[in-house]
Regions:
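Long amphipathic alpha-helical scaffold regions
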Residues: 35-36, 49-52, 57-59, 88-92, ...
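HEAT/HEAT-like alpha-solenoid repeats
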Residues: 17-50, 78-95, 121-138, 166-181, ...
Length: 215
């Protein structure tokens, strides 16, 4: 939590008033430098927070996803090749997270990571680690987070590098598993609405991006 506050403080410092005096600017620059140093040290000390993501506490896992998102946005230089090899399977394969209370922060991390580091997809077994878990996630109705997860599906599709997946088979599997998740017995009106809206947006997105998935 302290590290997360440090990261957020660093973001605030970036947005300080441009009319600040030179003394204030020097002070703020020093604070920012110290903030980045602390963030880098914490990232290394806690081994990319991989162990924390395995916590039995959903609150801790959710906070860790948020923390990683802050790092990706504001301290991206800590994600070197070795770090990417360790983190890519964990972040892109995070769909085995079954606690719906974690899904909002989980999605933020996945989307920001995939957009910021498209090369990350080359550091993991896409079909075994990412897609198999993603298909299970969809089949199980997003483990109870339909209203959170369905609106993010188009963003996820858009973030996947075209070369990372097999076109025709990927689209078929995606729609098949998405529909399977829709056929659950208990589906609220809000869940049904979220599904219908998401399905429409997905269909339109696929039409607009058909060249990414050659048939």
């Amino acid at each position: 939590m302290a590290t997360l506050i440090d990261i957020l403080l660093g973001v605030k410092l970036q947005n300080c008033d441009v009319d600040s005096t030179s003394t204030e600017k020097r002070s703020l620059s020093k604070v920012r430098s110290n903030t980045l140093s602390s963030a880098e040290a914490a990232f290394c000390m806690h081994k990319c927070f991989l162990d924390v993501l395995k916590s039995k506490s959903a609150v801790i896992r959710s906070a860790t996803y948020s923390l990683l998102t802050s790092y990706i946005k504001h301290v991206p230089h800590v994600f070197d090749e070795e770090t990417m090899k360790k983190l890519s399977p964990t972040i892109l394969g995070a769909f085995h997270e079954k606690d719906a209370s974690c899904h909002s922060s989980m999605w933020d991390t996945i989307l920001v990571f995939s957009r910021k580091f498209p090369e990350a997809w080359s550091y993991c077994n896409i079909h075994k680690v990412v897609l198999s878990r993603f298909w299970n996630f969809l089949q199980n109705g997003c483990y109870g987070s339909k209203q959170i997860s369905y609106p993010r599906l188009v963003q996820f599709l858009d973030s996947i590098p075209p070369k990372a997946v097999m076109g025709q088979q990927f689209v078929f599997d995606f729609l098949h598993n998405l529909w399977d998740g829709r056929n659950q017995r208990q589906l609220s009106a809000a869940d049904s609405l979220a599904f219908c809206i998401a399905f429409k947006h997905i269909f339109l997105w696929l039409l607009e991006n058909v060249s990414r998935y050659p048939f």
